[in-house]
């Protein structure tokens, strides 16, 4: 009999599915925000709504980073704001480690736990912010089964 998914595996698998909506061909990133094991928002990286996406008009690169995109974490945070969902104490499941700006926003929004799969732009100050704010960070390896 197949082993049942843990909650972390379950929600991270959802983030990986959400990432498939990304319009970026450089990195498809997905995020799922939960409170008490209930999904309150999802997000993926892509252009500003109503404007051209990378897959339509190309990348706008600065310092090796595409500035056209809104990151998955930010889209999920903004979805919470639009729909009136408080994030205090929330967990975010994200396919890639949050960049510095996303880490600052997650800390400010009250996220207390980040579960991710892939390392990405592991900024030392992002890690320090998480430590100082008491945010638990978990890297979840892909199951071998």
Residue positions per predicted region:
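Zinc-dependent deaminase catalytic domain
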Residues: 1-145
């Amino acid at each position: 009999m197949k082993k049942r998914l843990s909650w972390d595996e379950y929600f991270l698998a959802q983030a990986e599915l959400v990432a498939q909506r990304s319009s970026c061909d450089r990195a498809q990133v997905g995020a799922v925000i939960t409170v008490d094991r209930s999904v309150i928002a999802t997000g993926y990286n892509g252009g500003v709504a109503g404007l051209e996406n990378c897959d339509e008009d190309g990348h706008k690169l600065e310092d090796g980073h595409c500035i056209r995109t809104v990151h998955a974490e930010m889209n999920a945070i903004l979805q919470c704001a639009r729909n009136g969902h408080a994030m205090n104490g929330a967990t975010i499941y994200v396919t890639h480690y949050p960049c510095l700006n996303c880490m600052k926003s997650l800390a400010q929004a009250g996220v207390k736990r980040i579960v991710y799969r892939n390392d990405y732009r592991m900024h030392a100050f992002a890690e320090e912010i998480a430590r100082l704010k008491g945010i638990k960070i978990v890297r979840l390896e892909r199951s071998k089964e």
